[in-house]
Amino acid sequence: MERPEAGGINSNECENVSRKKKMSEEFEANTMDSLVDMPFATVDIQDDCGITDEPQINLKRSQENEWVKSDQVKKRKKKRKDYQPNYFLSIPITNKEIIKGIKILQNAIIQQDERLAKAMVSDGSFHITLLVMQLLNEDEVNIGIDALLELKPFIEELLQGKHLTLPFQGIGTFGNQVGFVKLAEGDHVNSLLEIAETANRTFQEKGILVGESRSFKPHLTFMKLSKSPWLRKNGVKKIDPDLYEKFISHRFGEEILYRIDLCSMLKKKQSNGYYHCESSIVIGEKNGGEPDDAELVRLSKRLVENAVLKAVQQYLEETQNKNKPGEGSSVKTEAADQNGNDNENNRK
């Protein structure tokens, strides 16, 4: 093995880095279809390859240390490879003006190319993704719900009683594969970034595996080619900028942050097209504090689910107690003694 020169790496290490980078890029491409509408589709892959910007200053690193470093890189890559987000924090878009404007945009694109109708996101699904995560079972979902509830006071302290207004203007794409409405520049962006970082930290402290927050780019997806593999087979490989040229600087409206939902990517969507929601937090008040219909439905559903779960748990506990040896007979004996005493009292 050749000794690397000061400040550089040898050819073998260079080939390993290139091979690792290529494998990471292939993995990123394979998972892009499922995550492409999330804000982390453009995460820098250097960390996955163990590449840093720091020069190598220790030229006499032992072979043992090389093995340790290699093992750490493999574990980090394996952890990243096994990580597959299935839940996310969503800021739902409820402003009818924004929804109407996006539907006009979608129809304008479809009129120019009818094939793209299959690439459009339904209006009930419009949202901003704040954080993606992996929750593998019901216990982890409950931990996620607890983390979401803990997030509420941090956000309210950050906003200090003020509304966070999110104005949407203009169109952008991710690699001409995903079309989204841009969040206009302003102080609100920094506030939203801080909320995202706080959410990332809160969920990580609970032991939940979450996505990278440093590449968070808030956006509102309205179309993505990955929704229909048929498009690529029929020659539609990119979103032509000419299709949305008239909307390039269009003002779509403002959304006031009032709710954050913990949603599932995989469970069946609600009847209105919105994602399955495990729990929500309300930030401030909307319309005088009156919850909307969708929120009432979610709260009612959650209450019913909790009631059913408690009833099932109680039934299981009672069944287990009855089946324990000795307890059943003692219960019967106590009941018999009680009946005997009652009969004796009646005779008296």
Swiss-Prot record:
CMP binds at T129, H219, L220, T221. Residues 296-309 are annotated as: RII-binding. Disulfide bonds: none annotated. This is A-kinase anchor protein 7 isoform gamma. Expressed in brain, heart, lung, pancreas and placenta. It comes from the Eukaryota. Keywords: Cytoplasm, Nucleotide-binding, Nucleus. Coiled coil: none annotated. Residues 294-348 are annotated as: PKA-RII-alpha subunit binding domain. Residues 1-25, 316-348 are annotated as: Disordered. It comes from Homo sapiens (Human). Residues 330-348 have a biased composition (Polar residues). AMP binds at T129, H219, L220, T221. GO terms for molecular function: nucleotide binding; protein kinase A binding; protein kinase A regulatory subunit binding; protein kinase binding. Binds cAMP-dependent protein kinase (PKA). Interacts with PRKCA; only the cytoplasmic form is capable of interacting with PRKCA. The lineage of its organism: Eukaryota, Metazoa, Chordata, Craniata, Vertebrata. Pfam families: AKAP7_NLS (PF10469), AKAP7_RIRII_bdg (PF10470). Residues 295-319 are annotated as: RI-alpha-binding. Probably targets cAMP-dependent protein kinase (PKA) to the cellular membrane or cytoskeletal structures. The membrane-associated form reduces epithelial sodium channel (ENaC) activity, whereas the free cytoplasmic form may negatively regulate ENaC channel feedback inhibition by intracellular sodium. InterPro entries: AKAP7-like_phosphoesterase, AKAP7_isoform_gamma, AKAP7_RI-RII-bd_dom, Cyclic_Pdiesterase. Transmembrane segments: none annotated. The keyword Nucleotide-binding applies. GO terms for cellular component: cytosol; hippocampal mossy fiber to CA3 synapse; nucleus; protein-containing complex. GO terms for biological process: modulation of chemical synaptic transmission. It is found in: Nucleus; Cytoplasm.
